[in-house]
Amino acid sequence: MHGRQVHNGHRDLLVLSKGAYVPRRWLRDTIKTPLSDAADKLHHPWQQAAAAPRYLVDILCPDGGLVLDPCCGSATFGVAALSSQRRPRFVGVELDPAVVAIAAERLAQVGNEEGAS
C-alpha cells in the first residue's frame, strides 16, 4: 500500500427483546457518526462519541424499555438512555471502582438536568 495504512473496525451489538421484535426504523449495518476526539474523552480514556448511542437508543429501545451496557465505562450509553424521550431504564456493569464513580457522577448529572427542566 506504499506506506499507507488501512484500519477496519467494528463493534458488536446485541439486541434482545421479549416477544417479537418490531423495529421502529430499519437498523443499517453501518452507522455513520463522527469519530471520537479529545472532547469526547473528558471522563474516561476509552469514552466513545455520544452520537451512536443516542441513535441506537432512539431506534431500538421501546418507550420505558431497558438499556443494558455490560461494559459501561463512563456510561455513554447510560447518558444517552437517560437523556432519551423514550425514558428507558439503564443498567450498566463496570469492574473498575474508579470508573464506576465517574459513571455514577455522569448519570446523576443527567438526572439533575432532567429534574430541572
Annotated model-derived regions:
Residues 1-93:
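Core catalytic lobe of class I
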Residues 96:
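Conserved SAM/SAH-binding beta-strand->alpha-helix loop
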Residues 103-104:
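Conserved SAM-binding loop
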Residues 107-117:
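S-adenosyl-L-methionine
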